[in-house]
Curated annotation (Swiss-Prot):
Compartment(s) of residence: Late endosome membrane; Lysosome membrane; Cytoplasm, Cytoskeleton, Spindle; Cell projection, Axon
Binding positions (GTP): 29-35, 71-75, 130-133
Domain of life: Eukaryota
Annotated gene: ARL8B
GO biological process, one term: cell division
Post-translational modification (record): Ubiquitinated at Lys-141 by RNF167, leading to its degradation.
Catalytic activity: GTP + H2O = GDP + phosphate + H(+)
Name of this chain's protein: ADP-ribosylation factor-like protein 8B
Gene Ontology CC terms, in alphabetical order: axon cytoplasm; cytolytic granule membrane; cytosol; early endosome membrane; late endosome membrane; lysosomal membrane; lysosome; spindle
Length: 186
């Protein structure tokens, strides 16, 4: 009986307290952006991902929060589109292949170049170091240092080490996004 009442209350709350947020997911190619979207949308991991050409848009509902995700291709020819799709969103999610140490400098430069754009000032950023299940992957502390995240002072910034394959820290990432959608409205 108590479970039924709880479910009814949740349903009733969802009628009046729906949250929506829009975010843009960017990062260098092969960092796991589309895989991340698939994992949070369906819980499914696939090794056979095709690189995103241009962009994909997907809506994911978690509880009473609907997240509209713009997944932008990471190839150099699409990086000029990043700023356009980051304007006006609730958050920017920047994905890094934490196991590919050769691309960390390029990834850092792209992130800082993007965040230097005046029209993106103040938009919170969630930096995700994906592929933590691989040997030699950077942990959160190393990512913060190598990506020079402490230099970013004009916005909220958060960093997590995740594995889409093992689904490590996906829940905490979603919690940050959902909490962020609620805090931006108040």
């Amino acid at each position: 009986m108590l479970a039924l009442i709880s479910r009814l209350l949740d349903w009733f709350r969802s009628l009046f307290w729906k949250e929506e947020m829009e975010l843009t997911l960017v990062g260098l190619q092969y960092s796991g952006k589309t895989t991340f979207v698939n994992v949070i949308a369906s819980g499914q991991f696939s090794e056979d991902m095709i690189p995103t050409v241009g962009f994909n848009m997907r809506k994911v509902t978690k509880g009473n929060v609907t997240i509209k995700i713009w997944d932008i291709g990471g190839q150099p020819r699409f990086q000029s589109m990043w700023e356009r799709y980051c304007r006006g969103v609730n958050a920017i999610v920047y994905m890094i292949d934490a196991a590919d140490r050769e691309k960390i400098e390029a990834s850092r430069n792209e992130l800082h170049n993007l965040l230097d754009k005046p029209q993106l000032q103040g938009i919170p950023v969630l930096v995700l170091g994906n592929k933590r299940d691989l040997p030699n992957a950077l942990d959160e502390k190393q990512l913060i240092e190598k990506m020079n995240l402490s230099a970013i002072q004009d916005r909220e910034i958060c960093c997590y080490s995740i594995s889409c394959k093992e689904k490590d820290n996906i829940d905490i990432t979603l919690q940050w996004l959902i909490q962020h959608s609620k805090s931006r409205r108040s």
